[in-house]
Amino acid sequence: MKVGILGGTFDPIHFGHIRPAQEVKQQLNLDEVWLMPNHIPPHKQSTHVSCEDRLAMAQLVSDELPQFKVCDIEAKRDSPSYSAMTLAQLREIHPQHEFYFIMGMDSFLNISKWYEWQKLFSLCHIVVCKRPGWQLDSNDPIQTTLKPRRKLATQATDGTAGNIFILNVAEQDISSTQVRQQLMQGHIPSAALPASIQDYIQHNRLYRGNSATNSD
């Protein structure tokens, strides 16, 4: 089974997360996409609502979208959510699966700063979402990692891990910070949030009086 992995704090989950994942699923013909909320994200000090609420919102999205599932492996962990550790655990649990780890171009350009980042290439394929027309600098140091591993979406993979796909996805001008700020001001950003997420946030009175300084 070909499974896309989309991790994040999802604080809250919004169309800026969902729509690129749908495009990746279609372009790479994935069987499923797993939404994986972080419990303790390594690059952020905290989240704004509980892990339970963020899991519940991800579950609402998966309930509405066929082939979207929630993976709670990081949510159950009481230590920072390092991707290499998570993918190693997933490969152990699901050795028959072929994992595609989805990230934005900004994350990919900083991947060499990640914990044991080189292990990722033995555990999964990397999918990098970029804006149409955006080009990676030919002199960027990441090119030494990218060039021998890059594949087009239409090309077959070399085994179950180790390839990198750079995919054009439609630009989504949405950030969790902006969504939280609007919610704190009493506005419901209906263009950014599925109706079920809007209802959940209102019913549970989330994002009221919290700081909204972190990004996605």
Swiss-Prot record:
EC class of the enzyme, as a word = transferase
What is known about what this protein does?
A: Catalyzes the reversible adenylation of nicotinate mononucleotide (NaMN) to nicotinic acid adenine dinucleotide (NaAD).
Q: Name one GO molecular function term.
A: ATP binding
Q: Where are the transmembrane segments?
A: none
**GO terms classed as biological process:** NAD biosynthetic process
The answer on whether this UniProt entry bears the keyword NAD reads yes
Record's protein name: Probable nicotinate-nucleotide adenylyltransferase
EC numbers on record? 2.7.7.18
Pathway annotation from the record: Cofactor biosynthesis; NAD(+) biosynthesis; deamido-NAD(+) from nicotinate D-ribonucleotide: step 1/1
Q: Family, per the entry? A: Belongs to the NadD family.
UniProt keyword Ion transport, yes or no: no
Q: Keywords for this entry?
A: ATP-binding, NAD, Nucleotide-binding, Nucleotidyltransferase, Pyridine nucleotide biosynthesis, Transferase
Species, as recorded: Shewanella halifaxensis (strain HAW-EB4)
Recorded catalytic activity of this chain's protein = nicotinate beta-D-ribonucleotide + ATP + H(+) = deamido-NAD(+) + diphosphate
